[in-house]
Amino acid sequence: DGLMLGNVLGEEFLTWLWFQSDVAPGAFVNKEGQPFSVSMEQRIVVQGGEGDTRETASVAGTLSPLTEARFGLGKGKKVTRATIRMEKDELAFQFTLSADDFTLGSMKLPKVEKPEEDDDPDAMLLERFYLMEVCLGLLESLYASFLRLRLSAAWGETVQEITAWIRRE
């Protein structure tokens, strides 16, 4: 079953990430081998068709299993954008990722404590930069894991598992 062959890597990545986060949300590790969890949150956009026949379905819901979007995958639509939540230790990051150009949007970082009066005035800004770097590092490790799998002989089996997951109610 060539479910994903010939598709854009970004669409495959988001589909794989949704699958993995659904079946094993805590099975991710960063470059240092430290575990973190991933979940698809609140909103997924799937598209199918070409030109004038292009259809888009945007599924949103705070605690929704996003069944309609998964149904769209079963009908040949592809994940084009998703809201992703990553948690490592006490840090939680949330952002929207676009499949076509890997654009990040609506990034929510962990709260940063307001500096004391005698602290460095740039401390808060530097802390936010650091948190963005942590978030991007986690995302980079996810994509590296995906690419290792995608370029391996195990990818065919993974496609079968994803297909079964899509068809599951």
Q: Where in this protein do the model-derived segments appear?
A:
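Intrinsically disordered, low-complexity, charge-rich terminal extensions
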Residues: D1-E169
